[in-house]
Curated annotation (Swiss-Prot):
Glycosylation sites noted in the Swiss-Prot or TrEMBL record: N178
A Gene Ontology biological process term: lipid catabolic process
Known EC number: 3.1.1.-
First-listed, main subcellular location of the protein, grouped into a coarse class: secreted
Subcellular location: Secreted
Origin: domain of life: Eukaryota
Main enzyme class: hydrolase
Protein name in UniProt: GDSL esterase/lipase At2g19060
Keyword Cytoplasm belongs to the record: no
Signal peptide: 1-25
PANTHER family: GDSL ESTERASE_LIPASE, GDSL-LIKE LIPASE/ACYLHYDROLASE-RELATED
Length: 349
């Protein structure tokens, strides 16, 4: 079983490499990023928030040190940019010039959610709705041609905080009291549909939407909802209907936008979190953080010890993944191993 899975991974990666090599140069003219801390590359540095990581040991393996990325090194958008053969940095919105709207901007913000109230206890954050507003202003001010915008890649990672920092954090939130798992998923998807429509109106035609991962298997939720002994089943059960409905939403958008040659794909982070696959890929620690996290916290303690074998860990802190895990996700997404209906590579070609 493990041998077959390993061979499948190798075959898929090799196929993706061959396809990419058939196309010369940068694969898209611009790349726009939306989402939460998983994608944030420094926007929260400028905000009054607890969700800020512009300090050591964050960035310990990043060339420029701590930048506001919630990892020890490169995050998922960084690796996506590499796969797209983009030679320049995609700047965070808070430090981007108007001219950079022609080549790409990262609007993601730690703590952001589909709901405006999500993560309000942490302080300032740029919600998904506000990120889209920022994008609209930037491309309109810069005068980016509509035909160019249709050729850009758009990636979105949003929804985790609506569970971590809302539904499963009762005070000061009431969503847990008002919605069942299925009802809450419907409520979130209703907002997601509206936001995707907004991006579509603004020219997005190549869109990769990342689902929510197995939040119950993060060190944070294992400690708070799993009794410290294993994945929090209740949390994962809550997330499942959201991912299913989000995947259905992507299918819906592909059906209604086929005339306009728009393509949407779903990146399944939930089903891909398999212990056997982790082991095959060299990860031996899947339930603990690599950095030092103080009791009751989720982010790394400043200037405290970190594990030396970071390539063996899935989690960097109590929620966010290591550079090694981020790289695997992107390779799998470009090879089509965790995407539906098409790989990110086919999305941009």
């Amino acid at each position: 079983m493990a041998d077959k899975m390993f061979k499948a991974l190798l075959w898929a990666f090799a196929t993706a490499v061959v396809m990419a090599e058939a196309v010369r140069g940068q694969l898209v003219p611009c790349y726009f990023v939306f989402g939460d801390s998983v994608f944030d590359n420094g926007n929260n540095n400028e905000l009054d928030t607890l969700a800020k990581v512009n300090y050591s040991p964050y960035g310990i393996d990043f060339a420029r040190g701590p930048t506001g990325r919630f990892s020890n090194g490169r995050n998922i958008p960084d690796f996506i940019a590499e796969e797209l053969r983009i030679s320049y940095d995609i700047p965070p919105f808070t430090r981007a010039s108007t001219e950079q709207a022609h080549t790409g901007i990262n609007y993601a913000s730690g703590g952001a959610g589909l709901l405006e109230e999500t993560s309000q206890h942490l302080g300032e954050r740029i919600s998904f709705e506000k990120q889209i507003t920022n994008h609209r202003k930037m491309i309109m001010t810069a005068g980016v041609p509509p035909e160019k915008l249709k050729k850009c890649l758009y990636t979105i990672n949003i929804g985790s905080n609506d569970y971590l920092n809302n539904y499963f954090m009762p005070a000061p939130y009431t969503t847990n009291e008002n919605f069942s798992f299925d009802e809450y998923a419907d409520f979130l998807i209703q907002s997601y549909r509206s936001y995707l429509k907004s991006l579509y109106v603004l020219g997005a035609r190549k869109v990769a939407v990342f689902g929510v991962s197995k939040l119950g298997c993060t060190p944070r939720m294992i400690a708070s909802h799993g009794g410290g002994k294993g994945c929090a089943t209740e949390v994962n059960k809550a997330v499942e209907p959201f991912n299913k409905k989000l995947k259905d939403l992507i299918s819906e958008f592909n059906r209604i936008s086929v005339v306009d040659h728009a393509k949407f794909t779903f990146v399944d982070l939930f089903s891909s979190q398999n212990p056997i696959e982790y082991f095959i890929l060299g990860f031996t620690v899947t339930d603990k953080s690599c950095c030092t996290v103080e009791s009751g916290q989720e982010l790394c303690a400043a200037n405290k010890p970190v594990c030396p074998n970071r390539e063996r860990y899935v989690y960097w802190d109590n929620v966010h993944s290591t550079e090694a895990a981020n790289k695997v996700v992107v390779k799998a997404a470009f090879a089509g191993l965790i995407t539906s209906p098409i790989s990110i590579l086919l999305l941009v070609l």
